[in-house]
Amino acid sequence: MSTVGELACSYAVMILEDEGIAITADKIATLVKAAGVTIESYWPMLFAKMAEKRNVTDLIMNVGAGGGGGAPVAAAAPAAGGGAAAAAPAAEEKKKDEPAEESDGDLGFGLFD
């Protein structure tokens, strides 16, 4: 669970990045203080070090792009046997072509007969 300090520093880093200003611990602390948020003194330093090592714009653009274990499994299937991968879409198309079965319809057991 994130804390107020993490959120405040995250927003400060995004503001600085958006404005094209160099991201430093002092600037993060200044923005957080201007917002009236009280945080522990180590947060700005941690976020400034992160911004030095990572491209913040890339991090923002890739939010939610990570996947669980599903992508490697799907990528491994064509490598293992291409025929099986081709057969799966054909099965899906076959299912789509079939008309939907009618519901049970009126069987004479009406609730308000």
From Swiss-Prot:
The protein, known as: Large ribosomal subunit protein P1y
Purpose of the protein: Plays an important role in the elongation step of protein synthesis.
UniProt KW Transcription regulation keyword: no
Modified residues (Phosphoserine): 103
Entry keyword set: Phosphoprotein, Ribonucleoprotein, Ribosomal protein
Family membership noted in the UniProt record: Belongs to the eukaryotic ribosomal protein P1/P2 family.
Residue ranges of the region described as Disordered: 86-113
Organism encoding this protein: Arabidopsis thaliana (Mouse-ear cress)
GO molecular function, one term: structural constituent of ribosome
GO cellular component: cytosolic ribosome; plastid; ribonucleoprotein complex
Subunit structure: P1 and P2 exist as dimers at the large ribosomal subunit.
Keyword Ribonucleoprotein in annotation: yes
One GO biological process term: translational elongation
